[in-house]
């Protein structure tokens, strides 16, 4: 403090008290006007060493002016911001009348640096100055009102609100903003009280604008250097002292916090003590009771914030430490293989001031009441829902058509009888328009309703689901091996009239269905509904002699002869001319929709699975409406 005080007093004594230079004679008088700008304090004459011992001797020249009250304030301010007082060197020179040569030098110095206008009170004017604390900027502001506009001036750097200043001059907004934008030194304030918003400009530029606009006398005492001295009215001196002291205190705190925040040690947040049990030893342990020495209030954040979940270190690979609350190294579902105990934070101090809510209560003594996890394998092989897919197909064995097998929201077959067969008659009427749409069947033909056609409602565009199931679970299908089928030599499959003969989808032909119902109907539907085999006349003429194990899926060569123009149909030994007439009608009705059928095949090939798609496509093409026989 003594060093800065001597620095401050030497600067003020150059133009106010020349007595310490009495031993130097005439050289001191010639040195006074230049030493203020050119000589730093270490290069002063040897007489300056005695300045700190007599600090009270420098206040006597100010006994006849108002600046005597500001001398202690300037000393206290200079300890923090000494450079901010220097722009106003002639602060008290107009009131001080010391020896002649010093006052002349100081007066010439003032004329060279500052404009004297705005310093004297105009005749008849009554100075009105108010002061307010600008909390956002941490400064005291002096305010002068003129023409209903409040113009403010900061105490710390003496900048003036240029926007309000030019508003007093009555300047238009465009011209005002253009002038203020061209200023090199300016400070734009957009947040705060209305009278403090605007563009702040330095003191000298504001005084130039006021002189140009001839509003200097209106704004008196805004430009008075010692504007703070005008606040010392006998009626409100106590309040003014409080305001100035508060402003200085805020400035001191601001500079102190700015200094301490740049220090080597950041302020500790005391959050580490909640992780005492799991933090490695190389991490600094900050005690909650250690007071801080950097001047800022202590932040006990760990007493007000909830405990971090699992202390954030139980998830990191930290060396195993014995703690009081452990999870007993249970392998949860045998899938998480932990090599060490997972510690829950146990360093919770008793100084916590939180309610014991479920979110903040540590897993403490109530942990013993928790039942341990059962050590069980991740997948139970005995459960059917974890087993392989083929065994799950057995649930379709003796059910006609389960409701959940109708995937993708296809219409459910509502008219199934007790034997699992659909009725043969007028059920097809509700689906007739669909078949006309797809196969170009004439509207006059009413076809018999077989299970193939009812299964057709489930089949379009979703064939790959059932195809994949039929390939994957081929062994679960129970195709009945009929000796009557295997003993057929060359006859047509429907000429034999055997009631036990079944086509590929476990159904009987309509001719033999009514006379002798077979016993195989109860166990025929053992699979989910799959696509219909053999979509052409080959369903009637299909040669099943070469199929192994009675499976009606014949090799591809069996279908090649049937697709070659139906020569085998007309050339085979038919039993009756009535059946040949039916086949001829069927062939004619098939020839109309032939082109559409191939288009349907091509479209559906795109939706088939890649494995076996072409071969399954031949077998899954449905029998069209007139393919089996027409009802008489």
From Swiss-Prot:
Biological process terms in GO annotation: conidium formation; positive regulation of transcription by RNA polymerase II; sporulation resulting in formation of a cellular spore
Domain annotation HTH APSES-type: ranges: 128-234
Basic and acidic residues bias (residue ranges): 428-438, 579-600
Example GO molecular function: DNA-binding transcription factor activity
Protein location: Nucleus
Positions of region (Disordered): 1-27, 246-315, 340-386, 403-460, 473-632
Null mutant phenotype: Leads to conidiophores that lack both metulae and phialides and that consist of a stalk from which chains of conidia bud directly.
Composition bias, Low complexity: 377-386, 558-576
GO cellular component terms given for this protein: nucleus
Pfam families for this protein: KilA-N
Expression induction: Only expressed at detectable levels in conidiating cells, but not in vegetative hyphae or yeast cells.
Biased composition (Polar residues): 1-20, 254-264, 275-295, 340-354, 364-376, 473-506
DNA-binding region: 162-183
Region (Nuclear localization domain): 578-604
Keywords: Conidiation, DNA-binding, Nucleus, Sporulation, Transcription, Transcription regulation
InterPro entries: EFG1/Phd1/StuA, HTH_APSES_sf, KilA/APSES_HTH, Tscrpt_reg_HTH_APSES-type
SUPFAM superfamilies xrefs: DNA-binding domain of Mlu1-box binding protein MBP1 (SSF54616)
Role played: Transcription factor that regulates asexual reproduction. Binds the StuA-response elements (StRE) with the consensus sequence 5'-(A/T)CGCG(T/A)N(A/C)-3' at the promoters of target genes. Required for accurate spatial organization of the developing conidiophore. Primarily involved in the formation of the uninucleate sterigmata, which arise by budding in this multicellular structure. Required for metula and phialide formation during conidiation but is not required for dimorphic growth.
Family, similarity comment: Belongs to the EFG1/PHD1/stuA family.
Record protein name field: Cell pattern formation-associated protein stuA
